[in-house]
Amino acid sequence: MASRSLGGLSGIRGGGGGGGKKSLSARNAAVERRNLITVCRFSVKTLIDRSCFETIDDSSPEFNNFAAILEQILSHRLKEISQSCRWLAHLQIPLQGQVTWFGYESPRSFWDYIRVACRKVSQNCICSIENMENVSSSRAKGRAWIRVALMEKHLSEYISTALRDFKTTRRFYEDGAIVLGEEANMLAGMLLGLNAIDFSFCLKGEGLDGSFPAVIDYTPYLKYIQSSDSISSDEEELRTLGSSGSESSTPENVGPPFLMDENSWFNKCKRVKQKYQLTLEQKGYLEELLRLRENQLSESVSQNKILLQRIEDSDLAHKLEKEQLEYIIVELQDQLTVLKNNDLRSRQELTAHLTNQWPSPGALDVNAVALDTLLYRKHNKQWYEKSYQSLDQLSAEVSLSQTSLDPGQSQEGDGKQDTLNVMSEGKEDTPSLLGLCGSLTSVASYKSLTSLKSNDYLASPTTEMTSPGLTPS
């Protein structure tokens, strides 16, 4: 910048007046850009400081000043509509105002640039602002967009997206604009701090009226510093002004300025005292708040200790209960194993007992058969006697009937009866002769004898046999 100024001055000295004007305009533009960015940074800082004490809304002077500064930045060196209306018509973007042969009647606003460059932002509010009924002018829509973006905490995102679309930015702005220079990156970074503030705006207020331009109040950001040389020069000027009225100047003539200085010092002292009292009150409030927070912290710490102790006790109780349950499980498993072994042993003993108690038929020897036969005789002796008596009676009846029918054969019958008695007296009492207990003339007795011989029947000692030949026919 300094080189450009020096170049401009040399051009002026050499007779080049056109180069000097260009360098001067460039320097003025640079100063304007730097001032706007600096004021915007101060405005953002004051907004953040104010948000710590109250909610930021339309009535806040800090916000109104910030909105005016941002509007001035976005409108800095904005091209006229007539220069780019053909390109916008090619993109099928609706424009505000009426078209004439010379361009648009209404002036260009930064909203025309924002709604084109920020359409790529996800979930943008462009369509919502376009459809607002109470906002008609392009400038009013731009102001509404600033408020909505601040409430959504997306203003920095909108500006960053618009600045990345360099082609669109070049079409809307002239050379030397803030959005085309290095200051644009600083602007996006400054606006990022506004995402921490909660804004509350009414989109139907007078602030959206686009009939008047935005005016920046630089007063809060100005600071006057008076040097020692300027103070002495002011006193000399006061003496000169006091002596101009009369030739004989006395110290009384300079009295009123000193009185004014005393009043000013008194006012300064009064303001300092007020600030001190205010600071003292704030200090007392902060100390009280600190004590309250310390009490809350101590209570929280004590409660935390109690809860930690409860958790430790619960963990210990759970561990003990777990150990007891594991011990019970092991004991039950041992008991189950013992019961299974006892059951298996009982089954084996029962099987062995049953096997010894009831041997297989092939394992029986001759002595066992004889013992079985003796036991059978003992238990069935009475039955044998009854059978023999019935056999004798039956034989007598048969012989009588034959004698009565054939007297010639009676003698033969007597002989047969004697033979039968002899045989009955000399027979062997064994189970093999049980089939002969019936009548020899009975067919059923003969069949039972045949079946007995064929099966080698051996009666059990505990079984009572009923021969079909013993039943009288």
Swiss-Prot record:
Bias type Gly residues, positions: 8-21
In-chain residues carrying the UniProt-annotated modification Phosphoserine: 232-233
Annotated stretches, region: Disordered: 1-24, 399-428
Residue positions, PTM Omega-N-methylarginine: 13
Residue span(s) of domain RUN: 57-206
Extent of Polar residues compositional bias: 399-422
A Pfam cross-reference name: RUN
InterPro entries to which the protein is assigned, alphabetical: Run_dom (IPR004012), Run_dom_sf (IPR037213), RUN_RUNDC3B (IPR047339), RUNDC3A_B (IPR047340)
Free-text tissue specificity from the UniProt record: Isoform 2 is expressed at high levels in brain, thymus, ovary, testis, leukocyte, liver, small intestine and prostate. Isoform 1 is expressed in the brain, testis and adrenal gland. It is activated in tumorigenic breast cancer cell lines and in the primary tumor of breast cancer patients. Activation also correlates with metastatic lymph node invasion and can be detected in metastatic epithelial cells from the lymph nodes and in the bone marrow of patients.
Domain of life, per lineage: Eukaryota
Coiled coil: 317-342
Subunit annotation: Interacts with RAP2A.
Entry similarity comment: Belongs to the RUNDC3 family.
PANTHER family: RUN DOMAIN-CONTAINING 3 PROTEIN RUNDC3, RUN DOMAIN-CONTAINING PROTEIN 3B
Name of this chain's protein: RUN domain-containing protein 3B
Protein source organism: Homo sapiens
